[in-house]
């Protein structure tokens, strides 16, 4: 398992599950976890804190299904398309330039 085990956020979990087209029950089943456990993880604020064994099972299930979890500043080795959050300053600059283009 990867370092993402300790860094996965609730937002990453929800996005990964959406990319796979799974509902919470299906992900729980694949990971060998209970549905309430996955619900609690997704309802977390920020980085998921919980039982290391449960987090490990979850990350393993996601990675086995083809998900690549990226931490801050990480680069992707994948060839497919992806989505990630911009740095907060970069998002503001993009918004400002978009507003200028619309005038």
Predicted regions and their residues:
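Short, charged recognition helix plus adjacent turn
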Residues: 67-103
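Small-residue (primarily alanine) positions within well-ordered alpha-helices
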Residues: 10, 28-31
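Residues in the recognition helix of alpha-helical DNA-binding motifs
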Residues: 16, 30, 41
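Short, conserved glycine- and acidic-residue-centered signature motifs
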Residues: 6, 20, 51-54
